[in-house]
């Protein structure tokens, strides 16, 4: 290791760092001559992609910090001025969550934009990510930045970019912005204006509460049943994030007086003190919600993640036990509900991803709706909806991805956990009026369209050796795809690296199985993992109790997973 060169780079970066806190942090690392830590901090520049930036807070170019955000914003601002002629008129929205350093990073973002002559429409308080996405369209802004790391652990933060169409950026915008960032001067040389200077010039514009009110009106308009319920008991958790006040107001306005918040998690707290990971999918994250629900005998539990763009749902089964629904089950419920109970449209359009359940497609075909599968990430859902509306006149009504992301209608062009919570409550009250439950409604759908069960397995492979192993796994399955998995014939192989189905090339391989099942594998885009997605379809026998059919389906799914992992091991790859 060239420690002399590493020290020189670190000293130069520290001198250009505008933040005394990270200056001191890096000085301490240098004083200890912790070369491994320094090598990691300076291994690369934190990569800017379609998801923007996300990383651990700390000093150095491979961390999230004020220096990185100032340079990133300068590059984004200059790219906008080069590609969006009216950006200095329309401006850019700046929002933030309640994580550590989010306020400072958002203020730096706005300060750089206004120094570049671009008006900054700034949320003065933390807001849900979907509110920032909504504001782009509501204000006709040229773009938006949301400072958030969503459901990552507390040591993370991030920087999410939306374009003027209200959707997250897609290629080639990410490459163009990254190229512009690479040309930016050191952070301490990036021009800034203070909020007072910006307000005096009319460039720093604090957003009024009217924008939030408009968002609430828009999501309240998503309801289909619209009658609320005095008797439906709901529990809601904000998971220490920013959704609490927004969800409470929306549910109250929608006619749901019996909403019990999880008190320990209702207020924003970037430390996330009651959970190991602030992600409703993680084991233990829902424990306080379950305890609250049992105490008040709740019918349904609604859980947002910290930036309120995702939603987890729990509901009671026939025995009265609370069950956590999968993202696919919630997606199927909402998709069917919107297509059957919503305003009848000439060409309704629903969209999901290539790693989500295929059941939404079966429902769409059965109900004569347009349907698409796109790559993972809500940016692809939003952009496909826009494309088909422009080319074919379809009307987008619903989109989802299995990782607890949903959007109903076109109020926002990103996943919206608050809006989805409101529509789930609306659906639950409709079910109650029909004499059934959320899970009873799911059984109705499964009897008509089949019982789909799914699971995901992640294999963590850290470091350079792990990255090489992941590449080898993908290459091996491409070079020699299995003829069957656990005795079930593979009827088709879909290699998305070749632009399968007209999609942009992506490092994903799927094996379609006889009977409607599927196994899909892809490397994670943000973590050192390879992800395996499994789906099995079972057709219940006439009159067969659904729990019995589900038990059989789960057993077959488990056998499919075991067979695939054995296949991976037999080929010499870890699983």
Where are each of the predicted segments found?
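N-terminal small/polar loop signature for handling phosphorylated ligands or for N-terminal nucleophile
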Residues: 93-156, 250-313
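An N-terminal, well-structured beta->alpha segment
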Residues: 8-109, 204-232, 242
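Long hydrophobic segments that form regular secondary structure
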Residues: 219, 229-251, 255-257, 286, ...
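Gly/Ser/Thr-enriched, mixed-charge loops and adjacent short helices
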Residues: 13, 17, 21, 37-46, ...
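Phosphate-binding and adjacent anionic-ligand microenvironments
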Residues: 294, 298-300, 321-323, 341-522, ...
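Short acidic, glycine/serine/threonine-rich loops at helix termini
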Residues: 103-108, 133-137, 155-161, 182, ...
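Conserved phosphate/anionic-ligand binding catalytic regions in large, soluble enzymes, centered on
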Residues: 42-62, 149-152, 238-246, 250, ...
């Amino acid at each position: 290791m060239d420690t002399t060169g590493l020290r020189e780079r670190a000293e130069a970066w520290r001198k250009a760092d505008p933040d005394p806190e990270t200056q001191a942090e890096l000085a301490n690392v240098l004083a200890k001559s912790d070369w491994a830590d320094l090598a990691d901090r300076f291994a690369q520049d934190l990569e800017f992609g379609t998801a923007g930036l996300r990383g651990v807070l700390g000093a150095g170019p491979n961390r999230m910090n004020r220096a990185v955000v100032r340079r990133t914003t300068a590059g984004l601002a200059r790219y906008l001025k080069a590609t969006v002629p009216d950006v200095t008129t329309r401006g850019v929205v700046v929002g933030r969550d309640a994580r550590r350093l989010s306020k400072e990073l958002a203020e730096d973002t706005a300060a750089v934009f206004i120094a570049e002559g671009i008006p900054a429409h700034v949320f003065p308080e933390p807001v849900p990510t979907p509110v920032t996405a909504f504001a782009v369209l509501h204000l006709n802004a040229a773009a938006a930045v949301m400072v958030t790391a969503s459901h990552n652990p507390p040591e993370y933060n991030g920087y999410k970019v939306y374009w003027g169409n209200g959707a997250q950026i897609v290629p080639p915008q990410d490459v163009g912005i990254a190229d512009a960032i690479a040309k930016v001067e050191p952070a301490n040389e990036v021009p800034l204006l203070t909020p007072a200077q910006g307000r005096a010039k009319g460039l720093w514009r604090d957003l009024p509460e009217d924008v939030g009110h408009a968002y609430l009106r828009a999501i309240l308009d998503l309801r289909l049943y619209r009658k609320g319920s005095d008797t439906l008991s709901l529990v809601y958790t904000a998971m220490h994030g920013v959704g609490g006040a927004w969800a409470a107001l929306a549910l109250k306005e929608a006619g749901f007086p019996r909403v019990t918040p999880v008190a320990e998690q209702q207020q924003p707290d970037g430390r996330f003190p009651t959970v190991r990971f602030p992600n409703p999918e993680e084991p233990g994250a829902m424990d306080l919600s379950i305890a609250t629900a049992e105490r008040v005998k709740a019918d349904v539990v609604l859980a947002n993640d910290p930036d309120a763009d995702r939603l987890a749902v729990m509901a009671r089964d026939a025995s009265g036990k609370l069950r956590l629904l999968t993202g696919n089950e919630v997606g199927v419920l909402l998709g069917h509900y919107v297509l059957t109970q919503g305003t009848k449209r000439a060409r309704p359009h629903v969209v999901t991803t290539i790693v989500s359940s295929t059941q939404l497609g079966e429902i769409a075909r059965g109900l004569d709706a347009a349907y698409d599968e796109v790559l993972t990430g809500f940016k692809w859902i939003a952009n496909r909806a826009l494309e088909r509306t422009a080319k074919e006149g379809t009307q987008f009504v619903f989109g989802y991805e299995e990782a607890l992301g949903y959007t109903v209608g076109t109020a926002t062009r990103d996943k919206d956990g608050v809006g989805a919570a409101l529509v789930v409550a609306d659906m639950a009250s409709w079910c109650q009026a029909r004499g059934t439950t959320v899970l009873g409604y799911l059984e109705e759908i499964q009897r008509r369209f089949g019982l789909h069960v799914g699971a995901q397995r992640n294999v963590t492979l850290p470091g350079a050796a792990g990255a090489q192993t992941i590449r080898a796994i993908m290459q091996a399955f491409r070079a020699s795809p299995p003829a069957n998995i656990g005795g079930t014939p593979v009827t088709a192989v879909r290699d998305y690296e070749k632009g399968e189905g007209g999609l942009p090339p992506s490092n994903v391989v799927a094996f379609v199985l006889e009977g409607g099942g599927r196994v899909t594998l892809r490397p994670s885009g943000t973590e050192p993992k390879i992800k395996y997605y499994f789906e099995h379809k079972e057709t219940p026998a006439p009159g067969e109790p659904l729990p019995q059919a589900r038990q059989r389906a789960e057993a077959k799914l488990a056998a499919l997973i075991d067979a695939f992992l054995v296949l991976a091991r037999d080929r010499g790859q870890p699983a």
